[in-house]
């Protein structure tokens, strides 16, 4: 009722699908909406939670409802047809283009000081302002504590409000090297609290890879082992050389 969600050009609310299904995106570039969103952390703070992880805040789009509706209509047209090669490729392209379609980021707008701004023009500021919403809220709601918060998406200047992790990596040796390269790059733009998913997020990790990654991560501010559903369980206690892992972790906390 207060217009705190992102809208389409015609004034209707933009509907997208992510983890919980259909959602609206909070317009965190709108100052009032940013404060409203930040205040939502109160219920979690009241439960004694002192660490937060802002994910999917590019924002990620599994599908835009308008594009999904168009896709279903086109699939219905193809249902009773004999799908030759070209038509079959059109069919697969329809479904394959649903997630994070660049055109969908041009379909919704932000209210920036009373001016409607198309999202793709300010894309990197969405994650930044979500981080800002949280950081400013923690100062208001819990001034006596320094609340831990890190984000997947953000922008230069976000170090005032929280940290960042390097996103969904893979359980590959070259992504271990990439972790080593990304951290100083982030440091050089002022982002100090950072780290990567130890062992890689996607694909199956080996014990050797997790051990080497843990050795690197003990020197990073954020030290977190994290993996995707459907991949090999990679908590360090699931491997054979538990004592070696214990020694590495003790160096950090000893």
Locations of the language-model features?
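Catalytic-domain carbohydrate-binding cleft regions of carbohydrate-active enzymes
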Residues: 1-254
